[in-house]
UniProtKB/Swiss-Prot annotation:
Lineage: Archaea, Thermoproteota, Thermoprotei, Thermoproteales, Thermoproteaceae
An MF annotation (GO) of this entry: GTP binding
Main subcellular localisation: cytoplasm
Domains as described in the record: Composed of three domains: the N-terminal N domain, which is responsible for interactions with the ribosome, the central G domain, which binds GTP, and the C-terminal M domain, which binds the RNA and the signal sequence of the RNC.
Keyword list, A-Z: Cytoplasm, GTP-binding, Hydrolase, Nucleotide-binding, Ribonucleoprotein, RNA-binding, Signal recognition particle
Top-rank lineage group of the source organism: Archaea
Protein name: Signal recognition particle 54 kDa protein
Keyword flag Nucleotide-binding: yes
Catalytic activity: GTP + H2O = GDP + phosphate + H(+)
CDD domains: SRP54_G
Subunit structure: Part of the signal recognition particle protein translocation system, which is composed of SRP and FtsY. Archaeal SRP consists of a 7S RNA molecule of 300 nucleotides and two protein subunits: SRP54 and SRP19.
GO biological process: SRP-dependent cotranslational protein targeting to membrane
Pfam assignment, any one: SRP54
Membrane-crossing segments per the record: none
């Protein structure tokens, strides 16, 4: 993935160097995005649609308050890349019956046999009893390769060194492992245009009725991954895909995008030669790594938290400011850090009405306030006026603070509530004009 990270790193350097995004700058950045995607071997039609979507969003969407345009552009780039590679949610591997039969297929040289062992170890580490079956009668070394890998990872193996009928070997192998949780059946590598071999894998499919058919694709084929997937799909259903050799090429991004275009789900990627260098594919995590941004999750949290604060602001503007709303504010503030952030979002610079001393005190006491609010009942959060001395003592005891700490928090809340009244009056005056 290093090569892929490097080419996207150059793109991010250009974006970070932008202070203001006007039409000319946006067009230049869009061309740079296109060049980057083409270097990653993403199919041209996907490059065009990706760029159009990203540019449209930047033009039409307003960044949340406090988020510089360049940061929001990176956020949009992240979201669109995740969509390009299959969506936010990773496709999980979940055996639904026993035994759960997995049929592996792919072209010769794709790393399919090694992948069979990698998948077996991945599942074994998660508590599944796994059996490996080798049906390749064309490549003599396949039998020894998978048997040795099976011994290395401690997984049972079935194969017939001198076997001639792949279909019969598959049937006997499945029968041999009928008490296993998962049976992984490896097949001979085949070219997508070799009709006889494609018919053979269809015959194996019909004979063992696999619960999942997994296509193994070499990342170095880039955008041609779509053609491979579509060729196999003509003969049997492809339920999921594993992309191998992701560590050795920048074209892996193109392979992932091309596969996503076919509708097949990438479930795993191979990121090295060792049997442990194998991981579940998550578009979100993959994009974060490719962009080389250790703080990407922080950036996403920041933007999402600001959106949450804007929802709180809507509640304030509508007059729905109670302690439950205040609690939502505290939750967002714990993500963002400084309390002054929420007041910066208020229109008309209402933050000036809160003293620096109050803000600094609030920053020191955020966690204490969160504990206090968590000690209140829902009725108390929605109806702060019922908080008498007895209730305050109970809340303080539950939060591990003194009653005066509860009263101090209520004072800050009351100040914010009064500000909301001022805000509503200003809004009504504007509407009356």
């Amino acid at each position: 993935m290093k090569a892929l990270t490097e080419i996207f790193g150059k793109l991010l350097e250009k974006i970070r160097g932008v202070d203001y995004i006007d039409e000319a700058t946006l067009q230049e950045l869009s061309r740079e995005i296109q060049r980057t995607l083409l270097k990653a071997d993403v199919p041209l039609d996907l490059v065009k649609s990706f760029t159009e979507n990203a540019v449209k969003r930047i033009k039409e969407e307003k960044p949340p308050a406090g988020i510089p345009p360049r940061e929001y552009l990176i956020y949009v780039l992240y979201e669109e890349l995740v969509k390009l590679l299959g969506g936010e949610q990773p496709a999980e591997f979940k055996p639904t019956k026993k035994p759960y039969i997995v049929l592996l297929l792919g072209v010769e040289g794709s790393g399919k046999t090694t992948t069979a062992a990698k998948l077996a170890k991945y599942l074994a580490k998660r508590g599944y009893k796994v059996g490996l079956v080798e049906t390749d009668t064309i490549r003599p070394a396949a039998f020894d390769q998978l048997r040795q890998l099976a011994e290395k990872i401690g997984v049972p193996f079935y194969g017939e060194r001198d076997g001639k009928d792949a279909v019969e070997i598959a049937k006997r192998g499945v029968q041999n492992f009928k008490n296993m949780d998962v049976i992984i059946v490896d097949t001979a590598g085949r070219h997508r245009n070799e009709e006889a071999l494609l018919k053979e894998v269809r015959a194996i499919y019909d004979a063992v009725s696999p619960d999942e058919v997994v296509l193994v694709i070499d990342a170095t084929v880039g955008k041609m991954a779509a053609a491979q997937a579509e060729a196999f799909m003509k003969y049997l259903p492809i339920h999921s895909v594993i992309i191998t050799k992701m560590d050795s090429t920048a074209r892996g991004g193109g392979a992932l995008a091309a596969v996503a275009k076919t509708g097949a789900k990438v479930k795993f990627i191979g990121v090295g030669e060792d049997v442990d260098e194998f991981e579940q594919f998550s578009p979100r995590k993959f994009v974060a790594r490719v962009l080389g941004m250790g703080d990407l999750d922080t950036l996403l949290e920041k933007i999402k938290a600001v959106f949450e604060e804007e929802e709180v602001l809507e509640e304030i503007e509508s007059g729905r400011l109670d302690l439950l709303t205040f609690k939502k504010q505290i939750d967002s503030l714990l993500k963002l850090g400084p309390l002054s952030k929420v007041f910066q979002l208020l229109p008309g610079n209402l933050a000036a009405k809160i003293s620096e001393e109050q803000i600094e005190l609030s920053q020191r006491n955020l966690k204490k306030w969160r504990a206090i609010l968590s000690s209140m009942t829902l009725e108390e959060l929605k109806n702060p006026e019922i908080l008498n001395a007895s209730r305050i003592r109970r809340i303080a005891l539950g939060a591990g603070v003194a009653p005066k700490d509860v009263k101090e928090m209520l004072t800050v809340y009351e100040n914010l509530r009064k500000m909301s009244k001022t805000l509503r009056r200003q809004l009504r005056l504007r509407m009356a004009k």
